[in-house]
C-alpha cells in the first residue's frame, strides 16, 4: 500500500507505529508519509499496550500526561460486540500464529465501515490481510 492508495481515509496505527511516529524513534520516517495530515485511529488494545509499557518502564507523571495527551488526539475504537465477533473469527483462524493484541487491533480495523487501513511494523498483519481483506 502507498500513501496515495489511502486517499483521505483515517488510518489505524498499531502500537509500534504509534510509538515510532510519536516519539520519533526507530523507523518513524518510513511511516510518516502514511500518517501525516491524516486522522489517527487506535484500538483499545493499543491504548492498553501503550499504558502498560509506560507503567512497566516507570514513566513519571510528566511523561504519562504526555502519553495521555497524544492518545486523546486519536479516535479510539472501543471493544464492542462487533469487534468481539471479528476477534473471534480472527482467533479461530490465527490463534497460534498471531498475538492476541494484534488480533484485537485487526478486529477493530475490520469492524469499521469502511474497513480501516492499518499501519503496522508486524508481519502478522500481512497474514490477516491475505485472509480478511485488511488493507495494510
Which residues does each predicted region cover?
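Active-site-proximal, substrate-binding regions of enzyme catalytic domains
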Residues: 49, 58-75, 82-83
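A general structural signal for well-ordered alpha-helical segments in protein cores
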Residues: 27, 47, 64-67, 84, ...
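Short, polar loop motifs at secondary-structure junctions
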Residues: 24-26, 121-124
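Active-site neighborhoods of divalent-metal-dependent phosphate/nucleic-acid chemistry enzymes
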Residues: 2-6, 74-119, 127
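Short, well-structured N-terminal submotif of metal-dependent ribonuclease cores
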Residues: 1-42, 53-68
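Nucleotide phosphate-binding site architecture
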Residues: 18-19, 48-51, 126
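Short loop/helix-cap segments at secondary-structure boundaries that form the rim of catalytic
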Residues: 31-33, 125-131
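Histidine- and aromatic-rich ligand-binding microenvironments
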Residues: 13-14, 43, 98-99, 122
Amino acid at each position: 500500500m502507498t500513501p496515495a492508495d489511502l486517499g483521505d481515509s483515517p488510518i489505524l496505527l498499531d502500537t509500534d507505529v504509534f510509538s515510532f511516529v510519536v516519539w520519533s524513534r526507530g523507523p518513524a520516517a518510513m511511516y510518516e508519509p502514511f500518517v501525516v495530515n491524516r486522522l489517527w485511529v487506535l484500538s483499545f488494545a493499543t491504548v492498553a499496550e501503550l499504558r502498560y509499557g509506560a507503567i512497566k518502564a516507570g514513566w513519571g507523571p510528566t511523561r504519562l500526561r504526555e502519553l495521555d495527551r497524544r492518545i486523546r488526539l486519536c479516535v479510539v475504537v472501543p471493544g464492542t460486540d462487533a469487534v468481539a465477533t471479528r476477534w473471534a473469527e480472527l482467533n479461530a483462524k490465527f490463534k497460534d500464529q498471531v498475538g492476541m493484541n494484534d488480533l484485537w487491533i485487526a478486529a477493530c480495523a475490520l469492524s469499521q465501515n469502511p474497513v480501516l487501513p492499518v499501519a503496522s511494523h508486524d508481519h502478522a498483519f500481512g497474514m490477516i490481510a491475505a485472509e480478511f481483506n485488511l488493507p495494510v
